[in-house]
């Protein structure tokens, strides 16, 4: 196993995750099997209970792990599936070590950061890397490890010490360190290297040396700037990689390839360069022949909360040669005029009461005005509530989560008595059986599918017959549980309890999103 560790300096938010995912993609394009690990130095066990407005999207993995959004980038760029083992947090590491100490596993030793915490980190990285198998049964040859945060952060210190030990243990040929740093421009447009020099100095103080430096900038990095960084930071000039901001993140692997990243990295890892597979580049470089505008009705004002939805729309749009322009509409602030200008409406997932009535009003507008609609998770539940109120006749229909009224949406039976909120929802992959005559079955090309879930509530079985008698059909089920719905007399009114966006890939767009984008495009053509 060979390891590529990606660290960051100067400031957070530079795009380490996209850089790590892009490195994985160019290595796959050279014929290698690659997996990824993300280290998040926070004390939370996982991302499940973190405020999405602060942390961004909670990405759900196939085994039910609730992870950082970078795991979603890895899955999309590398076209792989990961598990909760591939997301390490300080909370997981310390919890495991303390549990082992209580169990007596350390045989009376004084438990310390070094060696016990660092050994736990290394063991978990190694386990995640070596246990991963792709859909064809291939084991990974290279593991990309992204260390969250910035070099110098106190939270990252045990992880960086573990990385230092890994470098010593594996040595050149099996280990490479890629450091992502900021190259800010002054008022004259010249890129400044001093922050990078200080960042490399901080890295050295921890016993680490960068093998490759990736300079993030809105401008191209000149050869003279690369030479300056090379001279001050002791890396080969060819190992100073320009990472100029790209108009589309899926173009980043192409830009890194042009900069020679793959050749430098493979040389460091003592691997053959191999022939580049250009399939990825043809996949992401398609031309658009049409354009649609989709409104996403949001509870949270941060686009990163909905990154998988945004990417799934992009995947479907590319597949259909249709550019998807997204209008982000606050559920509490939008107007009917905002909805009238859209080609389609998407209601995403979320929790809590805020913005719910605005989402329900948008669903009613889409139903009555025959505007394509896709509802996801909470969006699915709100479609049921809107229909119960305005068609079935229960004016006080609501969710048990929201308060008093007719509970069209009820708590899952297995959630009764659950006290801990973390990791206790219905999470991860579950099978869904589709009605063979449904639109979704046609889109999936199958009646038995698997999708990812994240919810505590479901359609109340008491009202299913009444709802279906009025024309809303539940076309996807898991046993007695309702998983998907459609309206027959509508161009595209589809909602799912599951999250199809989490399994969407550039090469394999999500079926509900394909249907949604296609319906939006047809609606626009008719206008």
From Swiss-Prot:
- Spell out the subunit comment: Homotetramer.
Annotated residues that bind UTP are located at 12, 192-197, 228
Tell me which residues bind CTP.
Answer: 12, 153-155, 192-197, 228
Annotated positions binding ATP: 13-18, 70
Pathways involved: Pyrimidine metabolism; CTP biosynthesis via de novo pathway; CTP from UDP: step 2/2
| Key word Lipoprotein present | no
Supply the Pfam families for this chain: CTP_synth_N (PF06418), GATase (PF00117)
Q: What is this protein called?
A: CTP synthase
Q: Which reaction does it catalyse?
A: UTP + L-glutamine + ATP + H2O = CTP + L-glutamate + ADP + phosphate + 2 H(+); L-glutamine + H2O = L-glutamate + NH4(+); UTP + NH4(+) + ATP = CTP + ADP + phosphate + 2 H(+)
Highest taxon of source: Archaea
InterPro entries linked: Class_I_gatase-like, CTP_synthase, CTP_synthase_N, GATASE, GATase1_CTP_Synthase, P-loop_NTPase
- Enumerate the residues binding Mg(2+): 70, 146
Q: Which UniProt keywords apply?
A: ATP-binding, Glutamine amidotransferase, Ligase, Magnesium, Metal-binding, Nucleotide-binding, Pyrimidine biosynthesis
Q: Which CDD domains match?
A: CTPS_N, GATase1_CTP_Synthase
Q: Additional comments on file? A: CTPSs have evolved a hybrid strategy for distinguishing between UTP and CTP. The overlapping regions of the product feedback inhibitory and substrate sites recognize a common feature in both compounds, the triphosphate moiety. To differentiate isosteric substrate and product pyrimidine rings, an additional pocket far from the expected kinase/ligase catalytic site, specifically recognizes the cytosine and ribose portions of the product inhibitor.
Q: Which PANTHER family does the record associate with it?
A: CTP SYNTHASE (PTHR11550), CTP SYNTHASE-RELATED (PTHR11550:SF0)
Q: Which residues bind L-glutamine?
A: 350, 378-381, 401, 456
Point out the signal peptide segment.
Answer: none
Q: Which organism is it from?
A: Methanocorpusculum labreanum (strain ATCC 43576 / DSM 4855 / Z)
SUPFAM superfamilies noted in UniProt = Class I glutamine amidotransferase-like, P-loop containing nucleoside triphosphate hydrolases
Report the family membership: Belongs to the CTP synthase family.
User: NCBIfam families, from UniProt?
Assistant: PRK05380.1 (NF003792), PyrG (TIGR00337)
Gene3D superfamilies for this protein: 3.40.50.880, P-loop containing nucleotide triphosphate hydrolases
What activity regulation does UniProt give?
Allosterically activated by GTP, when glutamine is the substrate; GTP has no effect on the reaction when ammonia is the substrate. The allosteric effector GTP functions by stabilizing the protein conformation that binds the tetrahedral intermediate(s) formed during glutamine hydrolysis. Inhibited by the product CTP, via allosteric rather than competitive inhibition.
Q: Where is the active site?
A: 377, 499, 501
Q: Which HAMAP family match?
A: PyrG
């Amino acid at each position: 196993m060979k390891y590529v560790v990606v660290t960051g300096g100067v400031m957070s938010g530079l795009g380490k995750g996209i850089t790590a995912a892009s490195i994985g993609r160019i290595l796959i394009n050279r014929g290698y099997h690659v997996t990824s690990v993300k280290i998040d130095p926070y004390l939370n066990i996982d991302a499940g209970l973190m405020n999405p407005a602060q942390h961004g999207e909670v990405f759900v993995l196939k085994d039910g792990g609730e992870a950082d959004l970078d795991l979603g980038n890895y899955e999309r760029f590398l076209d792989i599936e990961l598990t909760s083992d591939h997301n390490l947090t300080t909370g997981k590491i310390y919890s495991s070590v303390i549990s082992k100490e209580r169990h007596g596993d350390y045989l009376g030793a004084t438990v310390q950061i070094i060696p016990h915490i660092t050994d736990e980190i290394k063991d978990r990285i190694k386990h995640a890397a070596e246990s991963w198998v792709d859909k064809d049964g291939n084991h990974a040859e290279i593991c990309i490890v992204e260390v969250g945060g910035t070099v110098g952060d106190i939270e990252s210190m045990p992880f960086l010490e573990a990385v230092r030990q890994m470098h010593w243990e594996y040595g050149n040929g099996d280990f490479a360190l890629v450091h992502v740093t900021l190259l800010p421009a002054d008022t004259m447009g010249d890129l400044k290297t001093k922050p990078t020099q200080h960042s490399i100095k901080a890295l050295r103080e921890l016993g680490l040396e960068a093998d490759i430096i990736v300079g993030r900038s809105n401008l191209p990095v000149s050869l003279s700037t690369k030479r300056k960084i090379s001279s001050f930071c002791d890396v080969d000039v060819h190992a100073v990689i320009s990472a100029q901001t790209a108009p589309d993140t899926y173009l980043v692997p192409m830009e890194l390839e042009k900069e020679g990243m793959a050749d430098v990295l493979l040389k460091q890892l003592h691997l053959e360069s191999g022939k580049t597979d250009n399939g990825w580049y043809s996949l992401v470089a398609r031309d658009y022949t049409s354009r649609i505008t989709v409104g996403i009705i949001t509870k949270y004002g941060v686009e990163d909360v909905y990154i998988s939805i945004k990417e799934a729309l992009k995947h479907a749009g590319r597949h259909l040669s249709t550019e998807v322009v997204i209008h982000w509409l606050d559920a509490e602030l939008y107007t009917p005029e905002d909805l009238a200008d859209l080609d389609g409406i998407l209601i995403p997932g979320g929790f809590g009461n805020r913005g719910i009535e605005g989402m329900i009003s948008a669903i009613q507008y889409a139903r009555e005005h025959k505007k394509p609609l896709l509802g996801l998770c909470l969006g699915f539940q709100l479609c049921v509530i809107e229909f119960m109120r305005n068609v079935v006749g229960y004016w006080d229909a609501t969710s048990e989560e929201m308060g008093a009224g007719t509970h069209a949406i009820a708590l899952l039976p297995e959630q009764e008595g659950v006290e801990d909120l973390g990791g206790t929802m219905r999470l991860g992959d579950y099978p869904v059986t589709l009605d063979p005559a449904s639109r979704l079955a046609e889109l999936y090309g199958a009646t038995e599918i698997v999708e990812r879930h994240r919810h505590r509530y479901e359609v109340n079985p008491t009202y299913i017959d009444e709802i279906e008698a009025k024309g809303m059909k539940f076309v996807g089920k898991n046993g007695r549980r309702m998983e998907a719905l459609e309206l027959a007399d509508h161009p595209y009114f589809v909602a799912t309890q599951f999250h199809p966006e989490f399994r969407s890939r550039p090469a394999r767009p999500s079926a509900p999103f394909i249907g949604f984008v296609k319906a939006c495009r047809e609606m626009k053509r008719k206008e």
